[in-house]
Amino acid sequence: MSGTIFYYTGTGNSLWAARKIAENLKNPVSILSMIGVEEKLDMARNDITGLVFPVYIWGVPAPVLNFVKSTPNLKGDYIFAVAVNGGQVSNTLVQLKTVMAMNGLKLSSGFEIKMPSNYIPWGGPGTKEHCQKLYESAEKKIKNIASAINNKEMRDVEKGPLWQKIVFSAIYKMTFSMVPGMDKNFWVNEKCNGCGICAKECPRKAILMVPEA
């Protein structure tokens, strides 16, 4: 059995999830970033193909949509998706399933995983204790997800309640084009410890670590 998990990550949550899923599968899989890979991808038909990505403003991030639309040989006997979110998956996986169908792809199953939020204006990830509980819960969920993948279970995609679909899907549509410019007012202060993880994992290499003068 061959397989590939494609991930898109902004701060590392989705990469962590992709790696944890891979660890729990019964057969080894490749883990590749979605960024730039469509230009060099020469993939034979996989038994399993996975898409792991964060939820952006209650929907699918533009780079993930672009990846699905621009990768004609993105195939697999079993294609699954995992939407990593801070607590509100909304209609994200339904949206992905629809876009995939429009591009001749069938989503076999779709799961959501709650992780610490990285949206600072709304409070960020919370305390270490809170984050640890989320990680422990996520690992349990990942084991269940991996079991479903190993057995190639066909499942309906997971989604939020109806009110999220109505309210948040509307917000997603209104703000989708604004996302690329939303980082222009980001800054760091003395709380930054200079670990460099953000610069290392940024998919667009938009963060530069500069020594203090």
Kindly give the residue locations of the regions a language model identified.
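FMN-binding flavodoxin-like domain, especially the glycine-rich phosphate-binding loop
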Residues: 2-5, 9-17, 22-39, 43-176
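Cysteine-centered iron-sulfur cluster-binding motifs in ferredoxin-type domains/subunits
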Residues: 185-205, 213
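Short, charged alpha-helical interaction segments and adjacent helix-coil junctions
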Residues: 176-187
